[in-house]
């Protein structure tokens, strides 16, 4: 199996390096990842400046672009040879509920799916037990690879920051929901000019049983199928009826 591995925390992040070590026990893995932290880059592509891949000593690559750039470049003529699966992660921090709208981790997987390949995104609820998340991915790939090939979806996997043996199991979940984000943080630079920082994410608001929030809080690995089709299908008929009214 040939796996393309990317992330949004950057090539040197512990999460992607740990995952690469585990995946290379049974697969051919090439990393194409950002050269720096590009968290919350979402699915943005770089269009106004060139992308500059830099090959590293172990034949992996880091790029001066976003996670989506990395996967797009890798699969659209940069890499030679077949790729069977795109894996993104391990992210330092969860991607639950509304986090998926901003996540570069999810975006790398979605770009792979958009370009016709099965894809998985994996995140850890912390910064300690990356090996637990890596083992979960290695457990799941043999089970799910065939099914993923038939699907237009990606899998969003979130792992509690616990030792592998303390994880309670796997749960297939829907996305939960966060409250609105906190206000931006206003400061002043050394010249007295106003600068702003994006504030913290909102707290979980819909964390009921059956959500990804609830599963991770209870010590389970959450698995949520994500589709790139953003159409609100349930609203099509009512919207058409509204437009036809005199």
UniProtKB/Swiss-Prot annotation:
In short, the EC number is 3.1.3.5
- GO MF terms on file? 3'-nucleotidase activity; 5'-nucleotidase activity; exopolyphosphatase activity; metal ion binding; nucleotide binding
Q: What cellular component terms from Gene Ontology apply here?
A: cytoplasm
Reaction catalyzed: a ribonucleoside 5'-phosphate + H2O = a ribonucleoside + phosphate
Kindly give the SUPFAM superfamilies that the UniProt entry links to this protein.
SurE-like
Looking at the keywords, is Cytoplasm present? yes
Q: Return the cofactor note field.
A: Binds 1 divalent metal cation per subunit.
Domain of life the protein comes from: Bacteria
**InterPro entries named in the record:** SurE, SurE-like_Pase/nucleotidase, SurE-like_sf
Query: Per the similarity annotation, which family is this?
Result: Belongs to the SurE nucleotidase family.
NCBIfam families, per database record: PRK00346.1-3, PRK00346.1-4, surE
Protein known as: 5'-nucleotidase SurE
Originating species = Actinobacillus succinogenes (strain ATCC 55618 / DSM 22257 / CCUG 43843 / 130Z)
**UniProt gene name:** surE
């Amino acid at each position: 199996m040939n796996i393309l591995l990317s992330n949004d925390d950057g090539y040197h992040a512990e999460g992607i390096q740990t995952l690469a070590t585990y995946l290379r026990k049974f697969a051919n893995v090439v990393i194409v990842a950002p050269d720096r932290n590009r968290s919350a880059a979402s699915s943005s592509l770089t269009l106004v400046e060139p992308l500059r891949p830099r090959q590293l000593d172990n034949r992996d690559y880091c790029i001066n672009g976003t996670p989506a750039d990395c996967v797009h470049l890798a699969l659209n003529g940069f890499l030679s040879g077949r790729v069977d699966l795109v894996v993104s992660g391990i992210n330092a921090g969860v991607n639950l509920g509304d986090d998926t709208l901003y996540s570069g981790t999810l975006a790398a997987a979605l770009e792979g799916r958009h370009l016709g390949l099965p894809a998985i995104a994996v995140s850890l609820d912390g910064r300690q037990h990356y090996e637990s998340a890596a083992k979960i991915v290695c457990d799941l790939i043999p089970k799910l690879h065939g099914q993923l090939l038939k699907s237009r979806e990606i899998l969003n996997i979130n792992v509690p920051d616990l030792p592998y043996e303390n994880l309670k199991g796997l749960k297939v979940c829907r996305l939960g929901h966060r409250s609105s984000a906190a206000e931006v943080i206003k400061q002043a630079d050394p010249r007295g000019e106003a600068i702003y920082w994006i504030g913290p994410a909102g707290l979980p608001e819909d964390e009921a049983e059956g959500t990804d929030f609830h599963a991770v809080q209870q010590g389970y690995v959450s698995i949520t199928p994500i589709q790139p089709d953003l159409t609100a299908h349930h609203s099509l008929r009512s919207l058409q009826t509204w437009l036809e009214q005199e």
